[in-house]
UniProtKB/Swiss-Prot annotation:
GO terms for molecular function: NADH dehydrogenase (ubiquinone) activity; NADH:ubiquinone reductase (non-electrogenic) activity; quinone binding. Pfam families: Complex1_30kDa. Its main location: membrane. This is NADH-quinone oxidoreductase subunit C. It catalyses: a quinone + NADH + 5 H(+)(in) = a quinol + NAD(+) + 4 H(+)(out). The gene is nuoC. It is a peripheral membrane protein. It comes from Rickettsia typhi (strain ATCC VR-144 / Wilmington).
Length: 197
């Protein structure tokens, strides 16, 4: 039996609705949030599969979607030496169940997703900022977060302490040409005619 057949059999046995999705060369499934914990538990406890290691958990922001946040779990089976991707989507106002009690490594990953996107995990009451400053305003990986942020942190020599102040850009935004050097730009700059000779 192939790996995807084993997973389909496990999901059917557990009455969990899953949808196979394409993620390059990886086996991946999309699942509704309320099926997430039972599915993770079944994958971990299955003697045939043993997906016991959470190698990564991250969020992605798709602001135009109704359920804008996609939470992605990367699992590893040491028994099969195979990876599995589980995806679930939630809206901005929804929360997602914490996987900490099933996969203990989820704790820090969930804190990171909370810090970067503002996604709440039910069952993980730790709301510490682990990548941003304690007084940081907002969630920086959301697509609606301003490019420059809201405040900047500087050391004030007069006060001899860290000070928060409004963002002050020392340089103006400029237009940059991001075309690769393998593809020449469609415009001609002064002096380009000399290079052709």
């Amino acid at each position: 039996m192939t790996l995807d057949e084993l997973i389909d059999k496990l999901a059917a046995k557990s009455r969990i609705l899953i949808t196979k999705v394409t993620v390059k060369d990886h086996l991946a499934y999309k699942i509704e949030p309320h099926f997430l914990l039972p599915f993770l538990k079944a994958l971990k406890e299955s003697e045939e599969l043993r997906f016991t290691v959470l190698t990564d958990l991250f969020g992605v922001d798709f602001p135009k979607r109704e359920k804008r946040f996609e939470i992605v779990y990367n699992l590893l089976s040491l028994k099969l030496n195979k990876n599995l991707i589980i995806k679930t989507n939630i809206s901005e106002k929804e929360s997602i169940p914490s996987a900490m009690k099933i996969l203990s490594a989820a704790c820090w990953y969930e804190l990171e997703v909370y810090d970067m996107y503002g996604v709440n995990f039910n069952g993980n009451n730790d709301k510490r900022r682990i990548l941003t400053d304690y007084d940081f305003e907002g969630h920086p990986l959301r697509k609606d977060f301003p490019l420059t942020g809201y405040t900047q942190v500087k050391y004030d020599k007069k006060l001899k302490k860290i000070a928060y102040e409004p963002v002050n850009l020392d340089i103006e935004y400029r237009e940059f040409d991001f075309s690769s050097h393998w593809h020449s730009p469609s415009y001609i700059l002064p002096g380009d005619e000399k290079a052709e000779k």
